[in-house]
Amino acid sequence: MPLVGFMKEKKRATFYLYKNIDGRKLRYLLHKLENVENVDIDTLRRAIEAEKKYKRSITLTEEEEVIIQRLGKSANLLLNCELVKLDEGERA
C-alpha cells in the first residue's frame, strides 16, 4: 500500500545574504517578516547596496512557505533589510 498521503514534497528556498548567518537565525528573520508593513528607506538602500556574498538554503515549513508566497521575490531583499536593522542595533 503506497504512503502517498504521508510523502509530501518538501520545498527548499535559497537566499543570498550579505552576512553569513545560520539556518536558525534565517528562520527567525523569516518569521519576523510575517508582520512587516513598511521599511525605512535608508535601511532599504543599505540592503540593496550590500554585496550578497553568502548563499543559504533551507527546507521550508508550511508557515514559511506562506510567508514566501506572500512576499514573493521581495523576500530576499526584506531578509537583508532585517539583517541591516540587526547590525544597526548591535552597533548602537
Curated annotation (Swiss-Prot):
Gene3D superfamilies: Uncharacterised protein PF10802, DUF2540
UniProt-listed Pfam families: DUF2540
Alphabetical list of InterPro entries matching this protein: MJ0366-like, Ribbon_hlx_hlx
Domain of life: Archaea
GO biological process: regulation of DNA-templated transcription
Name assigned to this protein: Uncharacterized protein MJ0366
UniProt organism field: Methanocaldococcus jannaschii (strain ATCC 43067 / DSM 2661 / JAL-1 / JCM 10045 / NBRC 100440)
